[in-house]
Amino acid sequence: MKIALLANPARGEINVLLATAYELIRLGHEVVFLTGSSFRNAIAEFKDEQNDKLLASRIQFSDLGTAKAFEDFTRGMQSHLKGLRKPPGDYSSMEICQIVALVTEQEFREAATLVRDRLLELDPDMIAVDALSPNLVTGCRMTGLPWMFTVPCSPSLTATRKSLFDPHPMGSRRQRTLMSALENLKLTIRETYGNAIKKDLYARRALLKKEFGLNSMGFNADSAIVPPLWKDRNCVGGIHFNTPGLWDSIRQPHQITFVGCGVTSDPENHSPSQAGTPISEIAGWSPLTKLSTSFDQSGQGERDLDVEWMDAAYAAGESVVYLNMGSMFLWTDDEVRACLRAFERLHRESGGKIKLLFKLNKPKRNPGSPGFTSPLNSPTAVATPKWDEKRPIDSRRPSGVSTLIMAEKLSEAIKNVKPRRKTDAEKGYSQFMLSEFEGLEYVRFTRWVHDQRRIYKHPALRVVIHHGGGNSFNEAVHYGLPQMILSQWFDTHEYAILAERFGIGLRSKHAPFVDEQDMFAKMLRLLRGPEAEKIQANAKIWSTRSRNAGGAPAAARLLETHALLHRQRKQARDPTPTAKTSLSVDTTEVATPTFTDTETSLSPKILSSAASTVTNP
């Protein structure tokens, strides 16, 4: 069968669809990606990674062009980064996300019409579209074909709010108290006012109802970041890439299936993590007990210097903390220094046993430029890191130097590091060169992570620090890793609150700012003592719950089921002999076990009887 997958080419949105496509082609289905031109190279790489001509032939790319409506909004977000970074409860953060995705009335009309026409031409058996891509969603709705949506963001964005005690997605008070109700009222009023005064939003709502003939979902809902898409008459359900139960928004629609982290069935994603050494072994900063077998690097392809650095740390009885703030975040010089000072103190406190793997994003252009409106910011292929940006940092301590002298040198090195900025327009964003940090033995900086799974599963890794993005949060949950969340904007604050509420991590006290003392204190709590042991135990429990949800394989099977149902209904309306023959072939294909010998295949009769429960809201 043919499955169409649509999303903005931003990695946060499309990564879960790539994982789902990985599963679909192994089920024997054809996958067609519909997205912007900038993702062409990534699709070519995805096909090459299959190492199988038959599997690669099942992956197709339908180029939607270079219009603003189809291009990666990562750079647009970066151009608004200073306004986007707000504390929990500040609605302006959500408003900026809305503005970045907004296009003019004519651009919206052209984009939705193009998507509709392309899909009708493809005539897929099922459509899956990213819920955060409004231009693509509208095109799907216009086809009249059955479709599904995928959700890579926080749970509250899909929750139904029936009272003021139900938390607003931007709410900082989420305990269903009187104060939280007042905050929710304030945020709702601000949201309604903002939706009413934006001309482009007004024009879009008019297009949906008058020109496109689509049903309204409500005044605020039609303009929401994630509308209640399950209310559309042709929507057959949604797939939420979050762990079931890991939420504080209790009214989740029954049409949405929570499948956990969007990881594939590749054994690399599911073999037992070696990071399960009891936290008590490092509670007193003692060296870790080595595992009976060395860390396996066989069959991993090209050399990975980050993993080699972690190997050396593990061999020396040292622990590693991994810091990755996602693809949109840009560091300032002060924030980089604050992190370095915090980890210098941790390194000293632990007797040299704690190290930091730091992924440092580099601005690819002027963050203050107007984004897509400038011809200078036309989309380019994803740049691969240069070799000199990945230079290894020696993990060995100089012999004959006392800890005190070394600490003084490290402090001096941090103070003396001076930023190198390309232009005055980029002032404020870190332009550090990686070579400037080679004297700091406790940290390795990297621009590019080759295989994040190998880092997550490494026995030296103890804690993950991230910005609270949906993928980062759920990957840490999947691999059972304690989290320190430096939440920055929009729904990242919700993930930070959830991590603390469910005891799987801690969050920054002064979000969105990076504070040295707060980071140092929180890392101590995560790395040693009874609280660290409790958090690690909770992380393991939620890891099991995430894996049980099924991930990308579950998403693929759900899409397959709906696709088969649609094809059967379509063939039932066409009583020709050809259709009957095709139906029998499809039934045979689906009856073949795919994942395990004991898995029960879905017969057409069973699927037909289940149709009413999954297609009707």
Swiss-Prot record:
Name under which the protein is recorded: Erythritol-mannosyl-transferase 1
The record's annotation in SUPFAM superfamilies points to: UDP-Glycosyltransferase/glycogen phosphorylase
* Family (UniProt): Belongs to the UDP-glycosyltransferase family.
User: When this gene is knocked out, what is seen?
Assistant: Impairs the production of mannosylerythritol lipids (MELs). Leads to low-temperature sensitivity and affect the cell morphology by impairing formation of filamentous forms.
Q: Where is this region: Disordered?
A: 365-396, 567-617
Per the record, where are the segments of Polar residues compositional bias?
Answer: 371-381, 578-603
This entry's comment on induction and repression of expression is: Expression is induced when cells are grown in cultures containing vegetable oil as the carbon source.
What biotech uses are recorded? Answer: MELs not only have high potential as eco-friendly biosurfactants due to their excellent surface activity, but also have attracted considerable recent interest because of thei runique properties, including self-assembly, anti-tumor and cell differentiation induction activities, and moisturizing and hair-repairing properties.
UniProt pathway annotation: Secondary metabolite biosynthesis
Q: What is the lineage of its organism?
A: Eukaryota, Fungi, Dikarya, Basidiomycota, Ustilaginomycotina
According to its UniProt record, the EC number is: 2.4.1.-
Q: Specify the enzyme's EC class, one word.
A: transferase
Asked if the Swiss-Prot or TrEMBL record annotates the protein with the keyword Transferase, the reply is yes
Question: Could you tell me the superkingdom of the organism this chain comes from?
Answer: Eukaryota
Q: Which GO terms describe its molecular function?
A: UDP-glycosyltransferase activity
The gene behind this protein is: EMT1
Q: Compositional bias of type Basic and acidic residues: which residue ranges?
A: 386-396
Ordered alphabetically, the record's keywords are: Glycosyltransferase, Transferase
| Role this protein plays | Glycosyltransferase; part of the gene cluster that mediates the biosynthesis of mannosylerythritol lipids (MELs), surface-active substances that enhance the availability of water-insoluble substrates.
